[in-house]
């Protein structure tokens, strides 16, 4: 069974936890009735083993097994420093 590994890009909005960051994933959706394109944001908790991310960084993350109650994503790379 070959499942595709989910990867996303987002902006770090909080780095105050130990070995964890909060990443905001922004996507654009069409309003179901009016058709206007709206920005929607999802906040994810991400595992950052080396505490290398700072708020404002653009990062790539991938899904993994659940690491805690709210953490099931891990940091792959820092694409752009803040």
Curated annotation (Swiss-Prot):
A Pfam family hit: Ribosomal_S17
Annotated GO molecular function terms are: rRNA binding; structural constituent of ribosome
GO CC terms in record: cytosolic small ribosomal subunit
Any coiled-coil ranges, and where? Answer: none
Q: What CDD domains does the entry give?
A: Ribosomal_uS17
Q: Which of UniProt's keywords are assigned here?
A: Ribonucleoprotein, Ribosomal protein, RNA-binding, rRNA-binding
| InterPro entries referenced in this protein's UniProt entry, alphabetically | NA-bd_OB-fold (IPR012340), Ribosomal_uS17 (IPR000266), Ribosomal_uS17_bact/chlr (IPR019984), Ribosomal_uS17_CS (IPR019979)
Does the record's keyword annotation contain Ribosomal protein? yes
Q: Which GO terms describe its biological process?
A: translation
**Record function comment:** One of the primary rRNA binding proteins, it binds specifically to the 5'-end of 16S ribosomal RNA.
Question: What's this protein's name?
Answer: Small ribosomal subunit protein uS17
